[in-house]
Amino acid sequence: MITLTHYLILSAILFSIALVGILRRKNLLMLFFATEIALNAVNIALAAFSKYYGDLTGQLFAFFIIAIAASEVAVGLGLLIIWYKRRGTIDLDSLQSMNG
């Protein structure tokens, strides 16, 4: 039987992987992927708590997080494509050369 602890351990492992990905990567596309993994880890935890307590609030929050993440990906990838067309690279170090 899968308990709440199993879901929370899975969520913590996924969030740790995402945190390492966010801190270690220099590629902006990989940063987007790591952010999505972190959001999905939070969704798993929210859905698990929702199932455990018998309340739909956690599932509603997870649904809204999925909707916000989809819009984040749409805007972020659009900006990333424009950045790649102008600079030819999507490395994080290339963002330091922005003139303000």
From Swiss-Prot:
Keyword field contains Oxidoreductase: no
Gene3D superfamilies referenced in this protein's UniProt entry, alphabetically: 1.10.287.3510
Annotated catalysed reactions: a quinone + NADH + 5 H(+)(in) = a quinol + NAD(+) + 4 H(+)(out)
Gene Ontology BP terms: ATP synthesis coupled electron transport
The keyword Translocase belongs to this UniProt entry's keyword annotation: yes
GO cellular component: NADH dehydrogenase complex; plasma membrane
Record field: transmembrane: 2-22, 29-49, 63-83
Keywords assigned by UniProt, alphabetized: Cell inner membrane, Cell membrane, Membrane, NAD, Quinone, Translocase, Transmembrane, Transmembrane helix, Transport, Ubiquinone
EC number: 7.1.1.-
One Pfam family cited in the UniProt record for this chain: Oxidored_q2
A GO MF label: quinone binding
Record-linked InterPro entries: NADH_UbQ_OxRdtase_chain4L/K, NUOK/Mnh_C1-like
Subcellular location(s) per record: Cell inner membrane
Superkingdom classification of source: Bacteria
Principal location: membrane
Topology term for the membrane: Multi-pass membrane protein
Subunit structure, interactors included: NDH-1 is composed of 14 different subunits. Subunits NuoA, H, J, K, L, M, N constitute the membrane sector of the complex.
Record function comment: NDH-1 shuttles electrons from NADH, via FMN and iron-sulfur (Fe-S) centers, to quinones in the respiratory chain. The immediate electron acceptor for the enzyme in this species is believed to be ubiquinone. Couples the redox reaction to proton translocation (for every two electrons transferred, four hydrogen ions are translocated across the cytoplasmic membrane), and thus conserves the redox energy in a proton gradient.
Family to which the UniProt record says this protein belongs: Belongs to the complex I subunit 4L family.
Protein known as: NADH-quinone oxidoreductase subunit K
Classification lineage: Bacteria, Pseudomonadati, Campylobacterota, Epsilonproteobacteria, Nautiliales
Recorded name of the encoding gene: nuoK
